[in-house]
Amino acid sequence: MRRAKNLLYVLTLMCTVSLAGQTRSELREMFISAEGDILFEDYAEALPKYLNLLQFFPENYNYYYRVGQCYLNTSGEKDKSISFLETAAQNINPQYREGKFRETGAPYDALYYLANAYRIGNELDKAIETYDMFMKEVDPEVYDTNLVRFQIETCYHALEMMRKPVYIVEKNLGDGINQRFSEFNPVISADEKSLLFTRELQFYDAVFWSLMKDGRWANPMNLTPELGIDQDYYTSSLTGDGKTLLLYRIDRYDGNIYESKLSGDQWSDVKKLNDNINTKYWESHATLSRDGMKIYFTSNRKESIGGLDIFVSERDSTGDWGPAVNLGPVINTVYDEDTPFLSNNDRTLFFSSRGHYNMGGYDIFRSDLDEKGEWGTPVNIGYPVNTTDDDLFFVPVGKGDRGYLSKFSSDGYGKMDIYRY
């Protein structure tokens, strides 16, 4: 108790000294700016602002809540959210006023986010207990309690799946590919000799290309200038022959799919796909069938069952993409589905979902095509490929018994590294 009082005294003293150099109106502007960042889900921008505000106001539990929320949405930093959310959850204001500078309490959401943080940290008993606590406190007409019940189910699924792990052999692609920043969204040709991925650089994200030579990956080349693009494009998929690259771009208020073609050793400028694929809604990922006649992609357009769904489109007589069709309720759920990929024989669909038999967040699933040409019930590919956090972008090779994936690891070269399974 004495230690806590001493800490509070030091923080209060820091506030007193700091306030002399920063006016209350400036702090209010900082708060408004941070709240705007949260609105647009720009947690990296919001975090230092809330940390600064917390130095000035160490007894404002709204700032503990916001800092915890930011860490929970920052890859590689999620474990830091727990202590802040625990503090916030002990100081709930039932009349919480979001966006108000004078608000000093935390909302009930702090409990929900704390439960998520426990789940991601594999503290599953604590997660279940905290989800239950949240359910007892909130009005079911205001909060989606069905989602909370589903989250509780995922915790029980996780406990079961972690007792029965699948056998995997995982290999980091090494420092020729992975560096101190993040490498993610790997896409690879069927012969596993052409690899493209997105790399986080100091000031922007860039598309890189590497070829396998003499059993080793050659030094990756930054393709961003050659593709005629800026930092808003991300690798989405690569055809088996390695000659057609699909990319995803955030275009102001929506996401769209683009393509580039390889001729010789030169990639073409990117071209936006037609209006049957790209709409005013959010298109986030796409992949092509082996013959290039079908495209599977994700969108939250009005025909979706819920959130992002997987759609398919076939080429018409002109060679362009025809109307898109929802894959239906066997694949799509009331929650999100994303990052679909096909095995090299087009018989197995791999994708990530928040709404099937999950162990937490997005999990990777596989669905096999039956004799009638219909996709079968999705099967979770298991732990430890799937975890209690979000798992996306599993790129299968061969018949899907092997694949590539990016993830954070304490023994990696940087943030996210690319692994082969």
Identify the residue ranges that each predicted region occupies.
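Alpha-helical segment of the N-proximal tetratricopeptide repeat
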Residues: S25-F56
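Short, conserved micro-motifs composed of acidic
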Residues: R28, G99, E103-A106, Y113, ...
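Structural motif corresponding to the intra-repeat A-B loop/turn of tetratricopeptide repeats
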Residues: F40, T74-S75, G121
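TPR-repeat structural position
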Residues: Y43, E77-K78, L124
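Conserved structural position within tetratricopeptide repeats
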Residues: N52-Q55, T87-Q90, R97, R102, ...
